[in-house]
Amino acid sequence: MTAESMLFNGAILSIVLVLVGLAWGFLLLKIQGGEAE
């Protein structure tokens, strides 16, 4: 595994983690907002 492929995989992993984190946070906010109403 070359350094370039490691950087590429790391970048993809970071983006995926950020997207999952945003989706999870949005889902929790939506659930909490629904219960509050």
Swiss-Prot record:
Full protein name: Cytochrome b6-f complex subunit 7
Sequence intervals crossing the membrane: 11-29
Biological role stated in the UniProt entry: Component of the cytochrome b6-f complex, which mediates electron transfer between photosystem II (PSII) and photosystem I (PSI), cyclic electron flow around PSI, and state transitions.
Pfam families: PetM (PF08041)
One GO term describing the cellular component: cytochrome b6f complex
Quaternary structure and partners: The 4 large subunits of the cytochrome b6-f complex are cytochrome b6, subunit IV (17 kDa polypeptide, PetD), cytochrome f and the Rieske protein, while the 4 small subunits are PetG, PetL, PetM and PetN. The complex functions as a dimer.
One GO BP annotation of this record: photosynthesis
Keywords: Electron transport, Membrane, Photosynthesis, Thylakoid, Transmembrane, Transmembrane helix, Transport
Organism: Gloeothece citriformis (strain PCC 7424)
InterPro entries: PetM_cyt_b6/f_cplx_su7
Membrane-protein topology: Single-pass membrane protein
Taxonomy of the source species: Bacteria, Bacillati, Cyanobacteriota, Cyanophyceae, Oscillatoriophycideae
